[in-house]
């Protein structure tokens, strides 16, 4: 039997580094550097002791803290211009249905709770193995349009995240109750709490209180105040009522400039585009070329990302032209940014079959499934596309669907257009700015 390397489908089943019941894929140095800054075993006193602690404060004592000059600007929300990461901490930047994401220095760290009863640890590696496999097999600049994780740790104990969330939630509850002169209690209504938190989170007085209480009560280098309401929705969702937040994966990524959905007209022009619509054409074209080149690879005409949408496309600096050859044409991108496909958690390619999606798809799909969903989400994210009649009319060719064959933008029926459909589409004058360098 030959030796499997990371350009082979078998790579996902390899276990290069073992630490008891955990596995590290990729660069151990990156991974261990991040892990050395995390305390996976941090514990706190029971909530009742926190309640007793807050009995030492009232509206008057909180007022004295508010009058203090000290303020930790990292407790502002990240979209607030006053936000500044003054410590080398983990800053919460996103929580979605399948991961909790933090930023530290030039890294992005994603924690994913896995259903260990459904999948073995090695069956949850697609987010690392699929992009790595594609990057190593693609031969041209198209490989630059993929986000590869630097490292991935499998089967790590992640209970500390849920414990930390509960500790911060209790602190916020008791702090808000003290501010309002209410009787202290750890019982709460989701609607009432979120309303109270959202009303205060941008207040400089509230941030001063957080600057005092977060270090004293939480004493952690993980700051979850940013976008805390997203974390709240994740952990409090009724479908996770009996969920065991036990084990999962830790993935280390390079830090991007933005996700594609964050670009508006002002930012598009700042990035060097003539308009927002030109920027949208740019990301569409780069993703289309990536798919075409993947489908050219042997045995890769089954590639599915399964969640191709603007917020799963990241933008990075591009220090040199990206040139991609297709038949007798070459596509030249001189922009100072590039788009790169991210979040391969539900993807499959070649012999790397993903059990997470295998049972969800009742019919066979190919690239068209992804682009049908992509176009729907582009039009929803950017209604400005409609102003470009030629472009918007062309995009409608991807979404000629009805309620019977499309549910929440996702195809329910098998439509297997050949990849030549996409090849012909991107040869149109719509993309003339990039075809043969715009000549």
Curated annotation (Swiss-Prot):
Report the GO terms under cellular component: host cell endoplasmic reticulum; host cell endoplasmic reticulum-Golgi intermediate compartment
Keyword field: ATP-binding, Host endoplasmic reticulum, Kinase, Late protein, Nucleotide-binding, Phosphoprotein, Serine/threonine-protein kinase, Transferase
Which Enzyme Commission number(s) are on file for it?
2.7.11.1
Q: How is it modified after translation?
A: Phosphorylated in vivo. Autophosphorylated in vitro.
Q: Which residues belong to any copy of the Protein kinase domain? A: 87-439
Q: What is annotated as the active site? A: 307
Q: Where in the cell is it found?
A: Host endoplasmic reticulum; Host endoplasmic reticulum-Golgi intermediate compartment
Q: Which InterPro entries match?
A: Poxvirus_ser/thr_kinase, Prot_kinase_dom, Ser/Thr_kinase_AS
What reaction does this enzyme carry out catalytically?
L-seryl-[protein] + ATP = O-phospho-L-seryl-[protein] + ADP + H(+); L-threonyl-[protein] + ATP = O-phospho-L-threonyl-[protein] + ADP + H(+)
A Pfam family that the UniProt record links to this protein = Pox_ser-thr_kin
* PROSITE patterns, per database record: PROTEIN_KINASE_DOM, PROTEIN_KINASE_ST
Main localization of the protein? host cell
What top-tier enzyme class does this entry carry? transferase
* Protein function: Essential serine-protein kinase involved in the early stage of virion morphogenesis.
Family note: Belongs to the protein kinase superfamily. Ser/Thr protein kinase family.
Could you identify this protein by its name? Answer: Serine/threonine-protein kinase 2
Source organism of this protein record:
Vaccinia virus (strain Tian Tan) (VACV)
> What gene name does this entry carry?
OPG054
């Amino acid at each position: 039997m030959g030796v499997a390397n990371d350009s082979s489908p078998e790579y996902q089943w390899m276990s290069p580094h073992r630490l008891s019941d955990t596995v590290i894929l990729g660069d151990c140095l990156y991974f261990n550097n991040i892990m050395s800054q995390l305390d996976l075993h941090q514990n706190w006193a029971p909530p009742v002791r926190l309640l007793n602690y807050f009995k030492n404060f009232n509206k008057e004592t909180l007022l004295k803290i508010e009058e203090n000059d000290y303020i930790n600007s990292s407790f502002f929300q990240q979209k607030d211009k006053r936000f500044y990461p003054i410590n080398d901490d983990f800053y919460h930047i996103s929580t979605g249905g399948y991961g909790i994401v933090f930023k530290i220095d030039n890294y992005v760290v994603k924690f994913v709770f896995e259903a260990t009863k459904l999948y073995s640890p090695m069956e949850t590696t697609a987010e690392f193995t699929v992009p790595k496999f594609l990057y190593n097999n693609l031969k041209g600049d198209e490989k630059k349009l993929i986000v590869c994780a630097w490292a991935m740790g499998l089967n790590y104990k992640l209970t500390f995240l849920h414990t930390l969330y509960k500790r911060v939630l209790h602190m916020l509850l008791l702090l808000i109750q003290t501010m309002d002169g209410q009787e202290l209690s750890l019982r709460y209504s989701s609607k009432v709490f979120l309303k109270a938190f959202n009303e205060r989170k941008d207040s400089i007085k509230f941030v001063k209180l957080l600057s005092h209480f977060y270090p004293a009560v939480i004493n952690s280098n993980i700051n979850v105040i940013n976008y805390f309401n997203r974390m709240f929705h994740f952990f409090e969702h009724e479908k996770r009522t009996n969920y065991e937040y036990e084990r999962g994966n830790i993935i280390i990524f390079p830090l991007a400039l933005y996700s594609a959905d964050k670009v508006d007209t002002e930012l598009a022009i700042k990035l060097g585009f003539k308009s927002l619509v030109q920027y949208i054409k740019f990301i569409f074209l780069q993703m289309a070329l990536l798919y075409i080149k993947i489908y050219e690879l042997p045995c890769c005409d089954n590639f599915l990302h399964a969640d191709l949408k603007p917020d799963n496309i990241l933008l990075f600096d591009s220090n040199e032209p990206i040139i991609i050859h297709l038949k007798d044409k070459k596509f030249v991108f001189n922009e100072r940014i590039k788009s790169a496909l991210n979040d391969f958690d539900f993807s499959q390619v070649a012999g790397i079959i993903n059990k997470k999606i295998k049972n969800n798809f009742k019919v066979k799909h190919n690239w068209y499934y992804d682009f049908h969903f992509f176009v729907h989400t582009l039009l929803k994210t950017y209604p400005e596309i409609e102003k470009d009649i030629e472009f918007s009319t062309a995009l409608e060719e991807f979404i000629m669907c009805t309620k019977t064959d499309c549910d929440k933008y996702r195809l329910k029926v098998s439509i297997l257009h050949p990849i030549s459909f996409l090849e012909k589409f991107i040869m149109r004058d719509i993309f003339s700015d990039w075809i043969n360098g715009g000549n």
